Amino acid sequence: MSNHKLIEAVTQSQLRTDLPSFRPGDTLKVHVRIIEGTRERIQVFEGVVIKRRGGGISETFTVRKISSGVGVERTFPLHTPKIEKIEVSRRGKVRRAKLYYLRELRGKAARIKEIR
């Protein structure tokens, strides 16, 4: 077995199949498992997906939200066990794969049309 096939076989077992399909422009609720000392809790991070990158086990996505007037972006590995679950709140209609232009927009200008 070649190295490439071996790596593919190992990573295939690590991929998660319980995640919903989502695209840039969608609004997600990401339930993240946070461990503080001996305690474990779930924190919900809700925002708009501004990018997805990579493939296979190394795929990541970035979610952006506005928290008390400050833009917060958080990048998550897609197949990490730290993500409890992902809920798609809204499906957004955008014509770009990377929504970096949302960083400069404020208020109503930063809205994304919803797919009906």
From Swiss-Prot:
Record's keyword terms, sorted: Ribonucleoprotein, Ribosomal protein
PROSITE patterns: RIBOSOMAL_L19
Function: This protein is located at the 30S-50S ribosomal subunit interface and may play a role in the structure and function of the aminoacyl-tRNA binding site.
HAMAP family, per the entry: Ribosomal_bL19
Name of protein: Large ribosomal subunit protein bL19
Entry's transmembrane regions: none
InterPro entries in the record: Ribosomal_bL19, Ribosomal_bL19_CS, Ribosomal_bL19_sf, Translation_prot_SH3-like_sf
Molecular function as annotated in GO: structural constituent of ribosome
GO BP annotations, alphabetical order: translation
Gene: rplS
Family membership noted in the UniProt record: Belongs to the bacterial ribosomal protein bL19 family.
Gene Ontology CC terms: cytosolic large ribosomal subunit
Lineage: Bacteria, Bacillati, Bacillota, Bacilli, Bacillales
